[in-house]
């Protein structure tokens, strides 16, 4: 009887929503396992690390792929698999270096010493060279022969930045140790540069194993939809099975929706980075509440629109009517003179023509006020001065360029609160 009750457990909607938020947020924020569609790369990396950690062989490899392709996630998943193996007699030491933080070999060596907890061993000892210092550190970890020595994994994030260090001393010595029969060492570099091998000096390149693991986000759109569905579906272990069933059905219908498919297609075309998809899903999940218990196609459309807003068009919604008039005048000038730069005096003259045509003084501002408005548009970076021109030129005659196009101005006019009709008509006449 108790089993039947637990099976048919029906929780309040609020509690179900709270659990949905907890499960999906954890799933979208915390990346576990390995990235989608990289089974062969994962297997290759596990075998490589296994030979170092378990069999005492030294190795080196590069993981290459664009940002967001899952390089760090792949390495993390492989290390979790390695450290979970029964053959692991002792924990291997891991040293993490980042090219953005360790900007010189000296800083990198200090960081290696710190992470290996060998500050006391080094003490005030003076070394003749970088190689001698690094060899001493690794010698201090030895407990006997090669197989009984503690293996060390060096992870070099932003690997290409280490190639810019003077003489590439760190890379040379790490690869040299990995090639020799000293302490078992694995050197794994992570980089987004496909031409990274061209950055290495000949002596460094000769000591590198030339093992390269490529991650290129090569999954198809149908696989992209599969990732979307898997990430948003609730597990079978969800306490309220009826709610979970309805939720998963709604997610399935979302994937089949033409509207959602179009949104995801645009996202896929813009970037195959799974993290950007996660952010899109997360914003949609945040809209779920007691009164709105399921994600809808409209939610995704709105979230996509918010994430892809035009920042410059948004700035236009907050400018004054005078500043908006000046932008329309600039656009009119660019249309007349085929995109040639303009100066304040030209814009002011065009604005005066508009005032004279309307035969009223609602927009008849003093020139000093108009100059201030023009300067404010420059501060907002909606216009910029032309490069290579003398700064001694009077500001009224300094050539400028408009950083907006027709579509951005039209969109701003449509959304501008209480935009005067005559200003709209003037804008449309110049934009038509």
UniProtKB/Swiss-Prot annotation:
Database matches in InterPro entries: AAA_16 (IPR041664), ORC4 (IPR016527), ORC4_C (IPR032705), P-loop_NTPase (IPR027417)
A cellular-component GO term for this protein: nuclear origin of replication recognition complex
Chain residues that bind ATP: 65-72
Superkingdom classification of source: Eukaryota
Localization (cell): Nucleus
Main location: nucleus
Pfam families xref list: AAA_16, ORC4_C
Matches recorded under SUPFAM superfamilies: P-loop containing nucleoside triphosphate hydrolases
GO biological process terms held by the UniProt record: DNA replication initiation
Subunit structure: ORC is composed of six subunits.
Stated family: Belongs to the ORC4 family.
Function, in words: Component of the origin recognition complex (ORC) that binds origins of replication. DNA-binding is ATP-dependent, however specific DNA sequences that define origins of replication have not been identified so far. ORC is required to assemble the pre-replication complex necessary to initiate DNA replication.
Protein name: Origin recognition complex subunit 4
Lineage: Eukaryota, Metazoa, Chordata, Craniata, Vertebrata
């Amino acid at each position: 009887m108790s089993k039947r009750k637990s099976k048919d457990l029906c929780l309040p909607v609020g509690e179900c929503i709270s659990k949905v938020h907890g499960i999906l947020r954890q799933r979208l924020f915390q990346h576990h396992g390995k990235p989608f569609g990289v089974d062969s790369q994962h297997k290759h990396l596990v075998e490589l690390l296994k030979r170092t950690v378990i069999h005492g062989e030294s190795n080196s490899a590069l993981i290459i792929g664009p940002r967001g392709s899952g390089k760090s996630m792949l390495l993390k998943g492989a290390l979790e698999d390695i450290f979970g193996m029964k053959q692991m007699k002792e924990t291997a030491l891991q040293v993490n270096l980042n090219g953005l933080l360790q900007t010189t070999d000296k800083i990198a060596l200090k960081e290696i010493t710190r992470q290996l907890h060998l500050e006391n061993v080094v003490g005030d000892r003076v070394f003749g060279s970088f190689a001698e210092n690094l060899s001493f550190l690794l010698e201090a970890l030895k407990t006997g022969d090669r197989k009984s020595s503690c293996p060390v994994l060096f992870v070099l994030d932003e690997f290409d930045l280490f190639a810019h260090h003077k003489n590439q001393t760190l890379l040379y010595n790490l690869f040299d140790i990995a090639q020799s029969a000293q302490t078992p060492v694995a050197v794994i570099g992570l980089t987004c540069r496909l031409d990274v091998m061209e950055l290495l000096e000949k002596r460094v390149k000769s000591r590198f194993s030339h093992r390269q693991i490529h991650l290129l986000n090569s999954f198809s759109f149908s696989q992209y939809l599969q990732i979307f569905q898997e990430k948003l579906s609730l597990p079978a272990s969800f306490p309220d099975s009826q709610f979970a069933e309805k939720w998963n059905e709604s997610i399935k219908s979302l994937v089949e929706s033409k509207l959602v498919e179009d949104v995801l297609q645009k996202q896929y075309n813009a970037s195959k980075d799974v993290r950007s998809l996660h952010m899109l899903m997360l914003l949609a999940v945040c809209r779920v509440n007691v009164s709105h218990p399921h994600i809808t196609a409209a939610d995704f459309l709105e979230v996509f629109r918010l994430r892809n807003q035009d920042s410059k068009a948004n700035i236009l919604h907050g400018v004054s009517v005078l500043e908006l008039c000046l932008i329309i005048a600039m656009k009119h000038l660019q249309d007349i003179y085929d995109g040639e730069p303009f100066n304040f005096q030209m814009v002011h003259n065009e604005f005066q023509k508009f005032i004279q045509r309307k035969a009223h003084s609602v927009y008849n501002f003093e020139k000093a006020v108009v100059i201030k408005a023009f300067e404010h548009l420059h501060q907002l970076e909606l216009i910029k001065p032309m490069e290579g021109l003398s700064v001694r030129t009077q500001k009224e005659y300094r050539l400028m360029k408009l950083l907006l196009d027709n579509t951005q101005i039209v969109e701003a006019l449509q959304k501008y609160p209480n935009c005067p009709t005559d200003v709209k008509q003037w804008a449309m006449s110049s934009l038509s």
